[in-house]
């Protein structure tokens, strides 16, 4: 619609979240904002109101500097890895190509170590030294939604740019961690992982893959593969290394580990505490636009929902055969967050 922006476009323009834009619209704080076919539209020349929930002060930002070890953070996104490893690893350099994710990252954390730009333009010789190098490289070409084009395709193939940067560093990190979807191990009879494993071995690292699903920690399913590599000149403590497969290894990892040179069977204690239930952690007073939500629900799913007196179901969009579709779960587990174009978020 000429002269108007969507909620998402307005959020990107103002550097806030789409949810914040929706709240401002519902509170009538954006002059000229209106609903057309149950969807908010905002005048392109509308002034940005003051947003009380913006993160813009040093007092609200997370300080990641107090940690005994340092890390590089490739494909950093909004900084979930940095947050997860806080207290143990402090990022000295982080990178992503997405401007909106960069805005969120910088709003969340103190210190200016984030470099916005294409990894193809990164030169390893310019990076500070670090103990750990983390790369959550793109998953699209290793997932079903991306038709499993493979590790040499355009998106997932950016892992080779990561290794090129690693080759250029003046001092290689002693530990590498690469994260991706289960297709890294499963697709193409494991050839994707075999190529990556060989590349890491050529660079002087012993490595192994583990498979974790977040549902053992919380009520959300997010199956992921973590490839952990340690340089050959580092002595690996026996406490974290097994002699055979364990609960961290799915069938694909077991099959690969039994045939590959330099494979490490990583070991860790298995969580024994049951995760919190979905119902116990839901925010019952969350602000949302009921019309916008119901607009996404097809009639066949509404019929199923209406068959319950009261139900908590999680829904997310997935791309199958090139088309978006809504999927619901009724088992108390949330599925992976999904991007509209496919792949996990």
Predicted regions and their residues:
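Conserved SAM-binding motif I beta-strand of class I
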Residues: 92-96
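Class I S-adenosyl-L-methionine
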Residues: 122-132, 142-329
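Short helix-start
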Residues: 7-8, 30-56
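Polyanion-binding surface elements
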Residues: 1-20
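Class I SAM-dependent methyltransferase "Motif I" SAM/SAH-binding loop
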Residues: 74-76
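Conserved SAM-binding strand-loop segment of SAM-dependent methyltransferases
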Residues: 111-118
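Conserved SAM-binding loop of SAM-dependent methyltransferases across substrates and taxa
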Residues: 78-88
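Short alpha-helix immediately C-terminal to the canonical SAM-binding loop
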Residues: 99-103
């Amino acid at each position: 619609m000429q002269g108007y922006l969507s909620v998402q476009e307005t959020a990107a323009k103002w550097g806030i979240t789409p949810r914040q834009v929706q709240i401002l619209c519902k509170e009538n704080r954006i002059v000229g904002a209106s609903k057309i076919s149950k969807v908010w539209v905002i005048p392109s020349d509308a002034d940005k109101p003051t947003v009380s929930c913006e993160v813009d002060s040093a007092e609200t930002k997370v300080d990641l500097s107090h940690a005994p070890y340092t890390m590089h953070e490739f494909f950093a996104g909004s900084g979930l890895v940095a947050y997860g490893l806080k207290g143990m690893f402090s990022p000295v350099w982080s990178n992503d190509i997405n401007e909106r994710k960069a805005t969120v990252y910088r709003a969340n954390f103190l210190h200016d170590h984030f470099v916005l730009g294409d990894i193809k333009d990164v030169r390893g010789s310019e990076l500070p030294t670090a103990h750990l190098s983390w790369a959550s490289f793109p998953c699209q070409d290793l997932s079903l939604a991306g038709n499993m084009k493979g590790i040499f395709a355009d998106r997932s193939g950016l892992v080779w740019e990561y290794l090129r940067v690693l080759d250029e560093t003046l001092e290689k990190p002693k530990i590498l961690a690469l994260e991706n979807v289960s297709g890294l191990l499963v697709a193409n009879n494991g050839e994707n992982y075999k190529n990556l494993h060989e590349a890491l071995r050529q660079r002087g690292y012993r490595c192994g893959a583990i498979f974790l699903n977040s549902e053992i920690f919380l009520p959300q399913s997010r199956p992921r593969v973590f490839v952990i590599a340690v340089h050959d000149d580092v002595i690996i403590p026996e406490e974290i290394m097994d002699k055979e497969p364990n609960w961290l290894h799915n069938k694909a990892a077991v099959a690969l580990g039994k045939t590959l040179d330099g494979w490490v069977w990583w070991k860790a204690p298995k969580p024994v505490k049951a995760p919190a239930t979905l119902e116990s952690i839901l925010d019952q007073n969350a602000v949302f636009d009921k019309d916008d939500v119901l607009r996404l629900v097809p009639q066949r799913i509404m019929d199923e929902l209406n068959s319950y007196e009261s139900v908590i179901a999680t829904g997310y969009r997935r791309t199958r055969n090139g088309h978006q579709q809504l999927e619901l779960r009724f088992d108390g587990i949330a599925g992976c967050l999904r991007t509209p174009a496919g792949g996990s978020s």
